[in-house]
UniProtKB/Swiss-Prot annotation:
This is Small ribosomal subunit protein uS13. HAMAP family: Ribosomal_uS13. NCBIfam families: PRK04053.1, uS13_arch. Belongs to the universal ribosomal protein uS13 family. It comes from Methanococcus maripaludis (strain DSM 14266 / JCM 13030 / NBRC 101832 / S2 / LL).
Amino acid sequence: MTQTEFKHRIRISKTDLEGKNPLEYALQDMKGIGRAMARAVIRVTELDPKQQAGYLADEDVLKIESVLEDPATHGIPSWMFNRKKDVYSGLDKHLIETDLVLTVQEDITNMKKIRCYKGIRHELRLPCRGQRTRGSFRKGTSMGVKRKK
């Protein structure tokens, strides 16, 4: 592996990443990629996780993008994906960046539309996962206590 010139910002899958960070940590700056997925991508592409991301060659960037595009064909197990059994296609997918954000928004909108419990809680801007609400999640202005004159 030859050292190419250092780039302070590298662009992978429509995302700018810091070139000074090690590759493992630079990949984790992308929305939808955590520690386990970053390590899996690096293992599949056979790159050095400690290498600064700014020294990546263009071929290596293309390799990383192809793995992120379709991780299943590169041997990454489906239990690592962030969207198992997609509602519309039935496939296991791993979404990143804007695809992930838009899909989550679409799921919440669908829950609101079918009026399920989680959808109603989202509409009311209350927690969906069973937290207690007596002391927390209070929004808006309160009247307070009026003082006698």
